Structures are given as C-alpha cells and as structure tokens.
Curated annotation (Swiss-Prot):
Its EC number is 6.1.1.19. This is Arginine--tRNA ligase. GO terms for molecular function: arginine-tRNA ligase activity; ATP binding. Keywords: Aminoacyl-tRNA synthetase, ATP-binding, Cytoplasm, Ligase, Nucleotide-binding, Protein biosynthesis. NCBIfam families: argS (TIGR00456). A motif ('HIGH' region) lies at residues 137-147. Disulfide bonds: none annotated. HAMAP family: Arg_tRNA_synth (MF_00123). GO terms for cellular component: cytoplasm. It comes from the Bacteria.
Length: 563
C-alpha cells in the first residue's frame, strides 16, 4: 500500500540518486564509488521545508569537498519532474531542503477516506513470521507495575508489526519449573497448614504475599485436610498444581482486562518433558562449546562475546535457568520465526549478550533476536512515590491500577516514554478529566468529532454530510493545513515506530494530532461554515477521527464517541 507522502519521499530519493550519477564527474566520484545510505526526512524546524536530506554530508570524504559545495553541485543536477517540489535550497553545513507545492495537501484527505481503518498500513514485513514474547512473569504472585509496562509495550509492538505486514505471534513464557516454583510449593505448604490452624512459617526466601493465603484457603475449601498427612512430595505437588492453575488463570484474566491477549502460553516445564533442554545441551557439546569443571557443565560464553563462561548444569546435575532459556530460544527458531523479539526488564540487560552468544554457538543467527530492555516504573500519588515491594506483598498490582485509573489511561501512560527511559506514572493525573491528562485530551478530540456528526444527523442529514469528494482546495486556513499535514505523516510515523519497536512515537503523534484538531475546532466552525466549506471541513474532521482511532487502536486505547 503506497501513500502520497511516502511516494513523494521515494521520488526525492530517486532524484537524489540520479543527481549523484549525473554529477559524478563534477564531484570527482568514479563509477565504483557507491552512494552511501542517506535519509530524506521531515525536518524538525518547520521553516526548513517539508523534507531534508543529509546526502551531501555523507559524500564529503569520497568527493573531497565541503558538504555545502557538494550540496550545491547536487542541486544543480537535480531533476524533479511531477514531484510537486516548489523549492530546493541548501542550508547550514550542507543539508538540502525541499519545499513542496502546497497543493500536494489536496490529495491527503481523499487518500484517508479511501483506506479508512486501514490507513497507515504497509506491507513492510511481507508476511515474515515474528514472535513477540513479553511479560512472562513468574506465576508466584500478582502482576506488578513492571509487568504492566511490559504488557503495554509488548502488545503495542506486536500491534505495530502486524499493522505493517508481519505475521505476529504474541507469547507468554510460563516459568513453571526451577527454584522459584519449588519456593512456591513450600510457601503454599506453609499457607495450607496455617489455614488448617497450624503454626507453620513461610520460608524466609519464600513468597510472603497475602494472595497465597487466599489461594491456600480455596485449596482447603476444596480438599480439606486430605493432604495434611502422607507423602510431602505428593502434598507439595498438589498444592503447586492448584496454585499454578489459579495464578495463571488470574494472570490471563488480568491481562485480558488490560486488553492483552496471547496466542501462545508456553510452558518452561514442557522443554524438559519434550527433551528440548537435553537436545540443546547435546548440540552445544557436539559443537565443542561445553566443558566440565568442578563437577559442573560450563558453556564457553566468553568465546561468544560474554564477559565470562556460564554454568549450564550444576554439580548436582540440575540444569540452570540459563540452560532452559537457551533451549527455549532454540525452540523459537525451530518453530520457524524469522524474527524473535523479547521485552525484558532492566535487570536482564546483561543476559542479552549471553543469549545472543548461545544462539551463535548453536548455529543460529543472533541478529534475528532483538531485546527491548525496559526501565523501572515509579508510581506517584499526591506528589509522593508509592513504594512497591513484591516479596512483602505491599506492591501495587495491575488489578489495583486498573481499578483506580482504568485501562485506557494505564495503556497510554505506560507507552508515553521509550522503553529505555524510567517512567514516572502520576496516578492523580491519569484519573483527572482535564486537558492536562493526555488520554482525556486525545479521547476528547475523538468524542468532539463524533458530536459534530450527531448534530448533523439531528438536523436531518446523513453523516458524514457529503456524498462525493468535497472541494478540499477551500481548506486554506493555517489550522486546516497544519492538521492535514500531520494526518499525512501517520503512515510514516507507524513505519518508523514499528522499525524502532517504539510505540511511544505513536503516543506522541496522536497527542500532537489531537492538539492540532482542538486548535482548529476552537478557531473555526464546521457546521454552518457555508456552502462547500462545510462539506470540506466535515471531510477534514472525519479523516481526523479515522486517524485518531487508528492510532489509539495500536496503543490498545479506546476511541469513545461520547465523554
């Protein structure tokens, strides 16, 4: 699917390549000198035009000239037929700026009308299979703010990639094996006996959250004291299965209420049951990347970019978590994913080079794995930090957050900053119904537009109020043109956000778009604007509503008709 603005950019790129070829003698470039990768971007400063390129700066070394000289030579060789380019100038150290004929804006609104809910889609992925794994919280407690941010990020990344043509699978890795699960069983055992009236302390390194008290109470209601005597392993196994089923069901329900639905819930234990961990260790051994020391089995991680070698099997014969994680990633590749994306917390930063090294050791392409590292969340209420502590049960859960601020505010606030930035979440702001609350501000723009069309129907007319393409050349006001220009940016914003795995770009874009609409709405009438102009403005606000809704959908936020 090609868009007007993207077509103009592509045309300018082709023209620049043609200019380099034509100017080779003047630039002193022989035929073997490749044209370096360059950009044609929308400049930040409005007075710099509609597009700018850095091509001249990149040719400085091979051409042995100043970038400004190169830029002037390139401009003299530019051929821009039928590209609606009004002016080309050289600015600063050697940027080439392009100003388009203002009439190009006339094609934007009909384009949005044509594509509707599909406006912004691209086929950049070509159907390539992508797996996005996110949250993957231990089933040992409730979902906290870090999990919530990961859920919002991961789901929006998946939505963006799907929107631009990738075949996306959302996956949750269930940590139902290993030490933390053993701790859960022992913690449940303590809560079970406490529910039966016995004095049985929770292990010091166990899980002290009050949620396990409730889980144990429900277990007693169902099974009574049946497991109080007898084989401890049988008792712990029954308690563990009950807790895991309940915890996973609760997680699934919470995430679904947050607007997140997974295609696959993948069990860590299944890697052992199917022998995948053993197969992975055997393959690493066969390829010569394992060795024994002090009774343990080690991976030569240092040979693959790691800062030290890693234990994969302890001296007691039990595989480490890293061993299972390598097997899990091997399984991802073996399932045919072309691109694997993980959303991990900041505490996993050092795990990235180790995992990439392990994949390389197995013979897989480590560059097919991308990891989005997510920084911490701080909650604020009344200007004070709301403290969180998972092990003591005093942290704020995702369920509590949803009850307090609602899904839309939570989803939007969690993607307002890049994953690599710390996030301060102001609970009071998220609940407010003022323009300072960005979610309210954006949704109010959509509701305002919907109100216009309700008024139209109340006057006996059928929405959207025009039966053919209105005369969009009547939209001459600066507020109108600024709004159309920003609407035209949406496909490129989506493509860049998908490429960067950066949903915050869409959060910023849709807030900016809402601001431009409010400015237009406060300055100009729509209904009753006069013959021809009313229809053109109805088309403008209808297209704005389409793009607001498309952008909010990518973020998992609703677009209300009324507020």
């Amino acid at each position: 699917m090609s868009y007007l603005l993207a077509g103009l950019r592509a045309g300018i790129e082709r023209a620049l390549r043609g200019a380099v070829e034509a100017a080779r003698p003047d630039l002193g470039l022989d035929s073997g000198t490749a044209i370096p990768p360059f950009t044609v971007e929308v400049p930040r400063e409005k007075n710099h035009g509609d597009f700018a390129t850095n091509l001249a700066l990149l040719l400085t070394k091979p051409a042995r000239r100043s970038p400004r000289q190169i830029a002037e030579i390139l401009v003299s060789h530019l051929s821009l037929p039928e590209l609606l380019v009004k002016e080309v100038t050289v600015a600063g150290p050697g940027f080439i700026n392009f100003r388009l004929d203002p009439n190009w804006l006339h094609g934007v609104l009909p384009e949005i009308e044509t594509w509707g809910e599909h406006y912004g889609r691209r086929n950049l992925g070509g159907g390539r299979k992508v797996q996005v794994e996110f949250v993957s919280a231990n089933p040992t407690g409730l979902l906290h703010m870090g999990n919530a941010r990961g859920a919002a990020l991961g789901d929006s990344i998946a939505a963006l990639l799907s929107f631009v043509g990738f075949d996306v699978t959302r996956e949750f890795y269930v940590n139902d094996a290993g030490h933390q699960v053993e701790n859960l069983a022992l913690s449940m055992e303590a809560r079970y006996f406490q529910a039966l009236g016995r004095d049985w302390p929770v292990p010091e390194d166990g899980y002290h959250g009050e949620d396990l008290i409730d889980t144990a109470g429900r277990f007693v209601a169902e099974h009574g004291d049946r497991f109080a005597s007898g084989d401890p392993d049988e008792r712990r196994g029954a308690l563990l299965r009950f807790a895991l089923e309940e915890k996973l069901a609760a997680m699934r329900a919470t995430l679904e209420s947050f607007g997140v639905r997974y295609d696959v819930w993948f069990s860590e234990q299944s890697l052992y049951d199917r022998g995948v961990v053993g197969e992975t260790l055997e393959l690493l051994k066969k390829r010569g990347h394992l060795y024994e020391r002090d009774g343990a089995l080690w991976f030569k991680a240092g040979a693959f970019g790691g800062d030290k070698d890693e234990v994969l099997v302890r001296r007691n014969g039990v595989p480490t978590y890293f061993a299972a994680d390598i097997a899990y990633h091997k399984d991802k590749y073996d399932r045919g994913f072309d691109w694997v994306i993980n959303v991990w917390g900041a505490d996993h930063h050092g795990h990235v080079p180790r995992m990439k090294g392990a994949l390389a050791a197995l013979g897989y392409d480590p560059d097919a794995l991308d990891v989005v590292i997510m920084q911490l969340v701080r909650l604020y209420r009344g200007g004070e930090i709301v403290r969180m502590s998972k092990r003591t049960g005093r942290y704020v859960t995702l369920d509590e957050l949803l009850e307090e601020v609602g899904r839309d505010a939570a989803r939007y606030f969690f993607v307002t900053r890049g994953a690599d930035s710390h996030l301060d979440f102001d609970l009071d702001l998220a609940k407010s119904r003022t323009n300072e609350n960005p979610v309210y501000y954006i949704q109010y723009a959509h509701a305002r537009i919907s109100s216009i069309f309700r008024q139209l129907e109340e006057r006996g007319r059928t929405a959207p109020g025009y039966r053919k393409i209105p005369d969009v050349t009547l939209l001459k006001e600066e507020a109108e043109r600024a709004l159309i220009r920003r609407l035209a940016d949406f496909p490129d914003e989506v493509a860049q956000a998908a490429y960067d795995l950066a949903p915050h770009r869409i959060a910023h874009y849709v807030h900016d778009l809402a601001g431009l609409f409010h400015h237009f709405y406060n300055a100009h009438r729509v209904l009753g604007a006069g013959d021809g102009l009313e229809e053109a403005r109805l088309m403008l606000v209808n297209c704005t509503r389409v793009v607001l809704r498309n952008a909010l959908t990518l973020l998992g936020v609703s677009a209300p008709e009324r507020m």
